[in-house]
């Protein structure tokens, strides 16, 4: 299985013949191209056109993040799998209000079901979350009445507000208090973890879209515009609770991530390099971990689940099979 490469240090990414290496002031590390799926760059890294040409030939994506861990863009090799037919079907389902709303509703419903699964998981392990679960279930009953994607987004936002109230109960750690959701910049340690982990889920979904016939620029819950990819944001809603949030709960509850892994920057709090390494390792392990897939009858990784989700969306767009969002079984 191909791997993701994370570069946190400053240095230069270079091509040498048919391989890559990353060079810092202290060392040179060779990168096996045949085993690399994508490169995520968090440090100050220089490269040249010759390298980018080689990455295109090797079909390796580069995702760039700023110092604070926010996604800023990708080097996306030419769309070798893009299908004109699929782009037309994506556009058709976006331009038709009913078809777009149908898909958007499924993304929200999938996200909410997985949020509930996470809460039930911790409730069954001694965390008192019954009131929050009941409130989320109550709000979710309004989804079928939505007539616009804005209304759907409002409901999801309301549910996430209640969901975030569970974080302090689940974590029970005086060094990691949620308070309220803040971003750009995050105001505390938990928000710094959430923002960083969410960025990783967005880019993972983008990398997997690249391996399908879908175009990431056409989403349904998040409005398509000139500025950004949106389909990966839609799909990420389903997986953030079971990948990003579970990763955060794990490293905080196990005391793996600590206050010294954060630093103040301007008017916010960000992960330092060691903190980023800790969360990156946990996220990578979670994406590579497997579950038993009921329909396929075999174990698949969480990264593979994202790819399978995209294949289901393709079938829906081609009107071969109605899309049903993935809901975890634990």
From Swiss-Prot:
Look up the domain of life of the source: Bacteria
Enzyme Commission number(s) of this protein? 3.1.-.-
Q: Which InterPro entries match?
A: CRISPR-assoc_Cas1, CRISPR-assoc_Cas1_C, CRISPR-assoc_Cas1_HMARI/TNEAP, CRISPR-assoc_Cas1_N
Q: Which UniProt keywords apply?
A: Antiviral defense, DNA-binding, Endonuclease, Hydrolase, Magnesium, Manganese, Metal-binding, Nuclease
GO terms for biological process? defense response to virus; maintenance of CRISPR repeat elements
What broad class of enzyme is this? Answer: hydrolase
Kindly list the positions annotated as binding Mn(2+). Answer: 156, 222, 237
Give the matching Gene3D superfamilies. CRISPR-associated endonuclease Cas1, C-terminal domain (1.20.120.920), CRISPR-associated endonuclease Cas1, N-terminal domain (3.100.10.20)
User: Which cofactors are required for activity?
Assistant: Mg(2+); Mn(2+)
| GO molecular function annotation | DNA binding; DNA endonuclease activity; metal ion binding
| Subunit architecture | Homodimer, forms a heterotetramer with a Cas2 homodimer.
Function as written in the Swiss-Prot or TrEMBL entry? CRISPR (clustered regularly interspaced short palindromic repeat), is an adaptive immune system that provides protection against mobile genetic elements (viruses, transposable elements and conjugative plasmids). CRISPR clusters contain spacers, sequences complementary to antecedent mobile elements, and target invading nucleic acids. CRISPR clusters are transcribed and processed into CRISPR RNA (crRNA). Acts as a dsDNA endonuclease. Involved in the integration of spacer DNA into the CRISPR cassette.
Write out the similarity annotation: Belongs to the CRISPR-associated endonuclease Cas1 family.
Give the protein name, as stated in the record. CRISPR-associated endonuclease Cas1 2
The organism that produces this protein has a lineage beginning with: Bacteria, Pseudomonadati, Nitrospirota, Thermodesulfovibrionia, Thermodesulfovibrionales
Q: Per UniProt, what is the name of the gene that codes for the protein in this document? A: cas1-2
